[in-house]
Structures are given as structure tokens and as C-alpha cells.
Amino acid sequence: SPARIMRMLTEEGKTIAWGTSSLWEGVDLQGASLDALVMARLPFPVPSDPIVAARSELFEDGFSEYSIPEAVQRFRQGFGRLIRSRTDRGVFVILDNRIVTKQYGVKFQRALPRCTVRRVSTERLFPLLESWRDGTFE
């Protein structure tokens, strides 16, 4: 349950939240509660959802004019759950390569505040996360 996950995140030491967008909507984990957030997929609304379908029909290009802006907003909210104040630190891992392979990916990249961005292979991901955890990240 979300309550159990919240309890684990606040009681445990170093933590990584890996979940769906519903986990970060309305969640405030300020401070050291959350060290890393892994986003497996860009948070696009489900096109088959009747509400999403109805809203998309209001636009000439529902994907570009509705789905992308909605996903970018959710993406920004996800990042915001990790970094809540000027003193918070964390790693935001995006596993969805569409952020660099699709034309709309730049909209997601521009939605992030100024921060260090690294594009790494999956083989280098865990060593990079370990160096961040150990304080040797450069």
C-alpha cells in the first residue's frame, strides 16, 4: 500500500523509490527520505482511458497538444518529489530512451531544473549510482 511504502521510505536509511506515477502524486518526502527515484517509463497518460480519449479529441493533435504536456507535467512532478528544497540531493534515473530518441524528448529535458545530467549505458548505471552514494560522484 502507499502508506506502507511511505513508512518504509521515512524509516529506512538510503532508499530508492521504484514505482508508478501514483506513488509520487501528493507525496512530500523532504530531506533524506528519498535518495533516488527511478522512472521506468515517461509518464504518458493511457490513451485508452475514456477521460484521456475525450480530452484528446478536443485537440487537432491529441498526442502533441494534450498527452505530451500532461506527461511533461507528471515528469516534472516526479522530479519534484526527489528534490523538494535547495538542500535536497538525489539521483533521478530515467530508463525510457524516448527522452533522447524522440523529438518530444527535449520537452522533458527542458522541464528539469538546472542539474547535472549524465547519459550512461545500463552497464555503467550501477557503478555511477554507487559513486554517488559513496560521495565520489564527479
Question: Where would I find each of the regions flagged by the language model?
Answer:
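ASCE RecA-like P-loop NTPase motor cores
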Residues: S1-E138
